[in-house]
Amino acid sequence: MHPPVPSLTDTTLVADLNARLRDVPDFPKPGIVFKDITPVLADPRLFGRVIDAMSAPFRGQHVTKVVGVEARGFLLGAPIALALNAGFVPARKPGKLPHRSVVERYSLEYGSDGVEMHEDAILQGERVLVVDDVLATGGTAEATARLVSRLGGELVGFCFLLSLDFLEGPNRLGRERVTTLLTF
């Protein structure tokens, strides 16, 4: 189990995040309320505090690679990798990487999708943290974790800026492996 995220007791950070996150109704489809993180990214002090808080539980966990899930996971994962002195690996939609890659498919409500990484992105035994902005159902994160395992990595955990707990993502991934700053 990961230590508690320091910022969860930092009511100022939580309040600042809640003030800056923007709800966009009916995006990308009618009935969905999209959590827009771009106002957080636009504020350098707040963005820095977010990266510090997201990386804090994993300091001392010997993370060697941080996998950022396309696309907003890149924006959080790369600076978290720097903060942890780890390498960064992008997990992309199939067909987007230039070198030989490995794909992991997963089911959606209506159809399927996939995530891919370069076949040499993670070495045997590397300790890997998976990062994304929002945890919803957990399908993409779960597929990314399977891909990490197929490539020989050891999953340290998952880290998200926010979790939509009503969609059951933390239960799917295993709550003890999931760290988030905000829960909705």
Curated annotation (Swiss-Prot):
It catalyses: AMP + diphosphate = 5-phospho-alpha-D-ribose 1-diphosphate + adenine. One of its GO terms (cellular component) is cytoplasm. It comes from the Bacteria. GO terms for molecular function: adenine binding; adenine phosphoribosyltransferase activity; AMP binding. It holds the Pfam family Pribosyltran. Its main location: cytoplasm. Pathway: Purine metabolism; AMP biosynthesis via salvage pathway; AMP from adenine: step 1/1. GO terms for biological process: adenine salvage; AMP salvage; purine ribonucleoside salvage. Coiled coil: none annotated. The keyword RNA-binding does not apply. Keywords: Cytoplasm, Glycosyltransferase, Purine salvage, Transferase. Its EC number is 2.4.2.7. CDD domains: PRTases_typeI. It is found in: Cytoplasm. Belongs to the purine/pyrimidine phosphoribosyltransferase family. Catalyzes a salvage reaction resulting in the formation of AMP, that is energically less costly than de novo synthesis. Homodimer. PANTHER family: ADENINE PHOSPHORIBOSYLTRANSFERASE. This is Adenine phosphoribosyltransferase. The lineage of its organism: Bacteria, Pseudomonadati, Myxococcota, Myxococcia, Myxococcales.
